[in-house]
């Protein structure tokens, strides 16, 4: 793992030099602020929490994560760059982790830029900052899980339109799973519904979003991240044979 920091810094610099990064982060922050202020009832309730604001994140991440994911492996799909990477003493795990962590940091920066809403909530009323902290952590974990999915899809193909369709389609499917569960509740066997509930990241996020940051739910997101990063590493190893 000696070269992991090198990969991390290189990807972070790549994001910093790409105008699309700033556009996607700005769009995420502005939409968070606009929708959070206009649709959240917490302004009327004395600013006690940011519950509705955080409920928007699974949908807003569809824009941000998709944009960041498409930049992860774009350079390495170039034959010259791919051949050069083969000559360097860099393992696939280092490449995957370094790039993923850099993208996750950008997500964290975008999330941190929504902090003024926390200031507003505290100004308007007695906000529960412990719950808000838990909500921010939950949102960060959700972003990491979405990003790991995008990382895997981008390792499969270099065609941006295919990446866009697959990433958006898969993340939309995941995001709408809870709605499908409501429809299946009285039509499917209970064990099927329970199994799908256990796999639904939105319901998990909803639990964390309520301020209940349990080890069980946190491990779910960590496991999802590790699973898709492992799948990404396997895919890259197969393609570089």
Predicted regions and their residues:
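Aromatic- and glycine-rich beta-strand/loop motifs that create alpha-glucan
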Residues: 1-23, 241
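Terminal transmembrane helical anchor/hairpin motif
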Residues: 41-42, 47, 51, 166-235, ...
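Hydrophobic/aromatic residues in alpha-helical transmembrane segments
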Residues: 65-69, 148-149, 231-232
